[in-house]
């Protein structure tokens, strides 16, 4: 027989002499989990995720708890919707039922962490305070817009100034009125005891009456409780209830408005001029 027989190699059926590249071993899950802490890629991803989470939490915390509200324009609908609480210092009292509050969020306005201060000049406070309308009460009207002051307006204003000016207060934000004031329930802060609710204090001392106009807010007590406190002051003749003739602030404002409307509608009497005026002067002399 000429030549030797050599079988053809079938790639689909390798013989024992054929060898393929070895398959790389796959690590088990235990190996992966055991090496994650040493893998620089996973360390980098974890560090970046942690830093991002801390940054996000910091921004959210700052916006919710430490960002200062400069004035009523910065009070958002979201703050009013959730009836947020703020704290601050009363910088001025312009009427018997409103105040201006300098918002002091966070721990940095009080010792031992005090690193921020409150302006003391009118220039420094301009556009930096929140105009607060005390919810649920109505104090006697001061003189303004050409109208006279209502009886007991001075006493109510002086009492409110002596009670809260320069004091630290907590306020629950409720709404914004047509004058861009924030309707809120203010409490006088006390470190060692319960905070004092200012609206109830005003009613109890006879410095205001319950506000009953449309859209009124009565805080956590409700209208019935506030009317009860008002009735107790009336029976004891405290404050404005000691007046011999009392007119509610609402009735007073309505009367002043009616008076103003009538005066605007009344035509002005024109002084006579020319020969008519001359004749009248001659008649008066005779």
Swiss-Prot record:
Statement: the UniProt record of this protein carries the keyword Ribonucleoprotein: no
E.C. number(s) listed in UniProt: 3.1.-.-
GO cellular component assignments: membrane; mitochondrion
Domain TNase-like: 84-243
Protein localization: Mitochondrion; Membrane
Matches recorded under Pfam families: SNase
Keyword Ribonucleoprotein on entry: no
Catalytic residues in the record: 133, 141, 181
Membrane-spanning parts: 41-61
Disordered: region residues: 1-29
Superkingdom to which the source organism belongs: Eukaryota
Protein residues bound to Ca(2+): 138
Molecular functions per Gene Ontology: endonuclease activity; metal ion binding
Protein keywords: Calcium, Endonuclease, Hydrolase, Membrane, Metal-binding, Mitochondrion, Nuclease, Transmembrane, Transmembrane helix
Topology of this chain in the membrane: Single-pass membrane protein
Primary location: mitochondrion
Family: Belongs to the LCL3 family.
Annotated protein name in UniProt: Probable endonuclease LCL3
Record organism: Cryptococcus gattii serotype B (strain WM276 / ATCC MYA-4071) (Filobasidiella gattii)
Organism placement in taxonomy: Eukaryota, Fungi, Dikarya, Basidiomycota, Agaricomycotina
Gene: LCL3
